[in-house]
């Protein structure tokens, strides 16, 4: 056995299968394309799912890949185990070879065996395998073709007490669909390592480690559980790169392989930790991989969906840095170390290094602020805590509202001899999960069972004769459609464009003399177009010859807006820099929305420059050239491949503008000349997430309407100001200055009134338990004036404590100011007692505190209750 680095193993695997007729497919995005059932790509077969289920075809039947995967959040969630076991990761690479009806068991098993024993040179005697207990074919191949002795081929049955086929050696894509037995290859680390053979009571030990799983997709399971043989059985295999690297490098933990040794060393230096065996360093090293690769695929930290999972991963890593004593910013510094380790295999992280580093740094700053805010809330709740249990409501509020980690709340509680109401917290979390589930987040879309494919004519025609191949009413196949029915139609050929690449689907009509179906939307399902709509009149049936006609005016508007995204993308790159990359888009008939990587809002000058570049290309009225060529050739010519899109070997290249101003891979519909756009105008911009901006634009007649609306508004403003447009800005500026002067005068008058100076104020000084106090009410004052007034009254009358109550008609407020000489008094404790009268809560420093509540009627009672809040002097 020879020693190999992680990079060498990855390269050797892909080259081996390429030499054996497999197409090398670059890792797909961690954000699954067109699969709302998955949060993240979590297995090597995910990018090929549509090939396995037969809804898509490609120009190859064998493939191999090193697929980037994430398991954190959702059904497959390894997050809490990461750092504390030898083989759990949030991010990992899955090496795989796949056959889509090409070869099967007799070829797949020898492929794996030869790679392990000949390429990697693993000792054959160190390998043993498992097979499904009914899979005699796989057993015979291992025994007769490979030559494994019977004692190293283990049959694994169904799990005790479970249904048939519920086994570690039987794989299924879901409750229905493709499935089949699998064979797993294990490596024996030796008798000195604890652990039993697969299938034994001690199988969870570390002696026998699974390194490769080969799935034989040979059945189709229907809703009744019946297994039918697939006409073209397929192969899906997976070998964790980190696991096989551990074997090849003679270590028992994935965290001891070359890649992780370097990342852990970088993490140790970043946090100032000398003990590199710390579990927290493993967490940080693992999480920087997940963080960087999720970001390079367009995921950004947020409070929902994938962004929420990313934020949780990042904050968990940062929290572990804090546990090691690092209170400063450190996590973003590890991006460079990861790029050094994996940039050669994944050059996209090199291109995105600066943006990702800055995004992580900003999230670290945000988390530091979160911790500060969370600690204040926690301290306020602890000040009124009765007993030793922090309520589930408090823990949930800290976590859900402020992003305050539950483990941090638990640490603080433990330091103070307190515990958490974990049951209450879990109940609130479960309720939140149910709400999320009900909202349909990441719900599974319906798959319609259709044979064949739709001939796609959207590039050539806007109307065509077609045949109805299938009808679905309420998701069930039907032969006939009656007037008023909402349905989905499938045609043998169609001029309709199915939603993809950010461009919405076409609408229009499908009709013959006896019926008309209004199409409201068109979607793609693999190679089939689904036409959604309603039968407006008559009857339509499967087999009918119909005319399919798109809404031409709507298509033209969509076409203009889609074409405008190309010019916009390039204009943004020329104005802001080449770091700008498209991160998403939505194109419809009314406007376009374009998301891109950039850290700051566009200035007025930058917006003007972008619009200038776009409209210059429009005025040149150059032809839009569209051609097809191999993917590699297109990229070599500088064509930009866009985020989230999947490309085949042959791609569509769209060149737009003079001197090839924009060159992109795109499957959408486009204008014939740049002049067809008429005018493009940016109408809005916003922040989508950290490091991602969004601009909205209009083109053509929509741009004209926008300009006319803006002009109308300006004319109305000028009329209200009783000015002309030329001098309106000057008049507004004068009005603003006058308003500021008046506001300042009002604030000064309020302060004068609040301080009083009358006999009533002096008479409000009262001795309570030996303390010189004042409790007065001053309504309709803002917080700043209340604070200043309390401090000034305290100093003016040399008081130990001042309490001021105030109401603005909606809320009651209390402020407490304590003199430094009255060290025995705590403003926070005083305000907590008084806040109960206004149904509120409060807190603050020993010398100043404030509270707010909704019970205005209780304000006078709160002031009168000051004696209850003061101890004897």
Swiss-Prot record:
Subcellular location: Cytoplasm
Annotated catalysed reactions: tRNA(Ala) + L-alanine + ATP = L-alanyl-tRNA(Ala) + AMP + diphosphate
GO terms for MF: alanine-tRNA ligase activity; aminoacyl-tRNA deacylase activity; ATP binding; tRNA binding; zinc ion binding
Binding-site residues for Zn(2+), renumbered to this chain: 562, 566, 666, 670
Alphabetized PROSITE patterns for the sequence: AA_TRNA_LIGASE_II_ALA
Superkingdom in the source lineage: Bacteria
Alphabetized SMART domains for the sequence: tRNA_SAD
Cofactor(s) needed: Zn(2+)
Protein name in UniProt: Alanine--tRNA ligase
Source organism of the structure: Dichelobacter nodosus (strain VCS1703A)
Gene name of the record: alaS
């Amino acid at each position: 056995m020879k020693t190999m680095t992680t990079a060498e193993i990855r390269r050797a695997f892909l080259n081996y299968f390429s030499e054996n007729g497999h197409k090398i497919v670059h890792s797909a995005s961690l954000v699954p394309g067109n699969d709302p059932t998955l949060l993240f790509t979590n297995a090597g077969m995910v990018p090929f799912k549509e090939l396995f289920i037969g809804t898509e075809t490609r120009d190859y039947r064998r493939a191999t890949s090193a697929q980037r995967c994430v398991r954190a959040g959702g059904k497959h969630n390894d997050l809490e185990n990461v750092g504390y076991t030898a083989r759990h990761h949030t991010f990992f690479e899955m090496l795989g070879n796949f056959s889509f009806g090409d070869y099967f068991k007799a070829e797949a098993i020898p492929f794996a065996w030869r790679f392990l024993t000949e390429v990697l040179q693993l000792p054959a005697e160190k390998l043993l395998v498992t097979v499904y207990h009914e899979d005699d074919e796989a057993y015979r191949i291992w025994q007769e073709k490979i030559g494994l002795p019977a004692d190293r081929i283990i049959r694994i049955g169904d799990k005790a007490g479970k249904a048939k086929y519920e086994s570690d050696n039987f794989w299924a894509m879901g409750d229905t669909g493709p499935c089949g037995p699998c064979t797993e290859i294990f490596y024996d680390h030796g008798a000195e390592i604890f652990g039993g053979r697969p299938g034994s009571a001690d199988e969870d030990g570390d002696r026998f480690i699974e390194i490769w799983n080969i799935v034989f997709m040979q059945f189709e399971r229907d809703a009744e559980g019946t297994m039918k043989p697939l006409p073209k059985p397929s192969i899906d295999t997976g070998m964790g790169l980190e696991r096989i690297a551990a074997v090849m490098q003679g270590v028992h933990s994935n965290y001891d392989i070359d890649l992780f040794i370097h990342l852990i060393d970088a993490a140790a230096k970043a946090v100032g930790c000398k003990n590199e065996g710390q579990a927290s360093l493993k967490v940080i090293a693992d999480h920087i991989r997940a963080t960087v690769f999720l970001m390079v695929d367009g995921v950004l930290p947020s409070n929902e969906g994938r962004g929420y999972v990313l934020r949780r991963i990042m904050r968990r890593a940062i929290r572990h840095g804090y546990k090691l004593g690092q209170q400063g910013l450190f996590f973003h510094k590890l991006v460079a170390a990861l790029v050094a380790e994996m940039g050669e295999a994944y050059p996209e992280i090199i291109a995105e290094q600066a943006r990702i580093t800055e995004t992580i740094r900003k999230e670290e700053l945000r988390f530091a602020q979160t911790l500060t805010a969370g600690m204040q809330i926690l301290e306020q709740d602890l000040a009124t805590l009765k007993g030793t249990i922090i309520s589930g409501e408090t823990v949930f509020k800290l976590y859900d509202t402020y992003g305050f980690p539950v483990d941090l709340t638990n640490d603080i509680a433990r330091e103070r001899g307190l515990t958490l109401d974990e049951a209450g917290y879990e109940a609130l979390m479960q309720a939140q999960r149910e709400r999320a589930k009900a909202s349909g987040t990441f719900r599974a879309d319906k798959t319609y069972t259709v044979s064949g494919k739709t001939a796609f004519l959207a590039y050539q025609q806007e109307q065509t004769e077609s045949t109805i191949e299938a009808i679905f009413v309420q998701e069930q196949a039907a032969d006939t459609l009656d007037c008023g029915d909402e349905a989905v139609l499938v045609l043998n050929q169609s001029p309709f464009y199915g939603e993809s690449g950010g461009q919405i689907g076409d609408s229009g009509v499908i009709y013959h003399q006896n019926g008309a179906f209004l199409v409201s939307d068109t979607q793609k399902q693999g190679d089939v177009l689904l036409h959604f709509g309603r039968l407006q009149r008559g009857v339509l049936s499967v087999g009918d010859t119909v005319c399919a006609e798109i809404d031409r005016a709507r298509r033209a508007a969509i076409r203009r807006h889609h074409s405008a995204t190309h010019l916009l993308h390039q204009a943004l790159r020329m104005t802001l820099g080449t770091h700008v990359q498209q991160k998403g888009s939505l194109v419809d008939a009314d406007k376009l929305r374009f998301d891109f990587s950039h850290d700051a809002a566009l200035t007025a000058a930058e917006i003007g420059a972008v619009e200038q570049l776009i409209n210059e290309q429009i005025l040149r009225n150059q032809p839009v050239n569209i051609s097809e060529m191999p993917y590699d050739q297109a990229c070599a010519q500088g064509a930009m491949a866009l985020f989230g899109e999947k490309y085949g070997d042959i791609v569509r290249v769209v060149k737009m503008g003079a001197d090839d101003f924009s060159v992109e891979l795109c499957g959408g519909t486009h204008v014939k000349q740049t002049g067809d756009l008429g005018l493009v105008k940016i109408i809005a911009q916003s922040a989508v997430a950290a490091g991602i901006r969004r601009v909205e634009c209009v083109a053509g007649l929509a741009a004209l309407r926008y300009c006319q609306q803006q002009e109308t508004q300006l004319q109305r403003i000028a009329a209200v100001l009783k000015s002309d447009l030329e001098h309106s800005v000057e008049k507004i500026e004068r009005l603003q200055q006058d308003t500021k002067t008046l506001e300042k005068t009002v604030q000064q008058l309020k302060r004068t009134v609040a301080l009083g100076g009358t006999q009533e104020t002096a008479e409000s000084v009262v001795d309570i338990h030996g303390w010189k106090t004042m409790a007065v009410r001053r309504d309709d004052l803002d917080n700043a004036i209340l604070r200043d007034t309390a401090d000034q009254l305290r100093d003016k009358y040399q008081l130990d404590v001042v309490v001021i109550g105030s109401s603005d008609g909606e809320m009651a407020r209390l402020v407490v100011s304590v003199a430094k000489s009255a060290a025995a008094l705590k403003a926070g404790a005083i305000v907590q007692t008084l806040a109960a009268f206004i149904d509120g809560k409060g807190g603050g420093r020993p010398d100043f505190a404030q509270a707010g509540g909704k019970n205005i009627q209780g304000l006078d009672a709160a002031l009168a209750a000051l004696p209850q809040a003061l101890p004897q002097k």
